[in-house]
Amino acid sequence: MIQVLRNAQVYAPQSLGVKDVFIAGSKIIGVVDAGCEFELPDGVEVVEHDVLGRRLIPGLVDCHAHITGGGGEDGASTKVAAPLAETYFAAGVTSVVGLLGTDDITRSTEELLAGVRALREEGLSAWCWTGGYHYPLTTLTGSPREDIVHIDAVIGVGELAISDHRSSQLTLDEVLRTASDCHVGGLIARKAGVLHLHLGDGKRGLDLIRQALEQSELPARVFHPTHVNRQRALFDEALELTKLGCHIDVTAFPIEDGDGAISAADALREYLASDLPGNLISVSSDGGGCLPVFDEQGRMVKYDVGTSASLLEALNDLTGSGVALDCALPAFTSNPAEHLRLDGKGRIAVGYDADLVVLDDDGSVASVFTAAETHYKNKN
């Protein structure tokens, strides 16, 4: 069967104009001007969907999501339930990378891998980081390098915590050893081999990453700090790291007055207005994770829960303020897909996976296609 999305305003993520997109199996086989001829085999069933001029974008790539649920920082009653697959589809997310956070004790790598399989069975593309906040790392094989090499779904280590009172207070040697395992494991397995680092509010900021780059031969792409928009000073440090070749990740968490954080939309808006490399920034959701507030003694006083819907909210914030969709979109699609070597993801082009999202005029998700199946349709 061939499926055709007719009359779509395609952002691939670059703007291509109004196109017809042809899909066979799980792959895009043609992107042509609307109404133009496209040769198809005789006798093949063709199913057409008229998009009616709406915007068609690649499925969003969320590289930081608690697919088995996060939380637990104030006892077991504060553990967050695992988000359903429908949650991701409704947010326009078709590719997700799961992880463990603070609680890498009662939650396990085994559970995380089962979560990846469950999402794949529901039609999502899913991977995971091995490890969690703490060192020594929680792994399946006993070695992060072996997890990366031997387990298909594992693309690197994360979210290993630094500059945070909940971290293992890592030394430089421990960071270097872990980053080396990521790098070499990635080389052997042809994977990203990335060390995905949780950044807290600690005054040391990104100092461990700077030291690691200064005192080792490891390439900058191995170090992937996230939550870098949680403080102004931290974001300034992160901008400097991109000049060395590091890829940085901002989080689309809610912002409260006086907490010092920068919204994902504001952070990306600032980044895009600079002369920094456009491919070295991504936006993730922390979906399913606990977003806690602690007192001065490190006790949690309240928390919120992250959601993948925050990605589309940030994207709409950007476009609503005048940022062109094709400028904003790479940070949500092609940038994370290419940095993490998620082949076939993040673009609308021949040979890529047919992970496609149709947007309504108001920026909400109208429908989602993955592997030629419709996984979500807005009921409104």
Tell me the role of every PLM-derived stretch:
Residues 2-3, 10-57:
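Histidine-rich, glycine-flanked metal-binding segment
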Residues 8, 25-28, 345-380:
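C-terminal cap of metal-dependent C-N hydrolases
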Residues 88, 116-119, 238-241, 271, ...:
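Generic structural signal for hydrophobic
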Residues 180-292, 300-302:
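Active-site core of metal-dependent hydrolases
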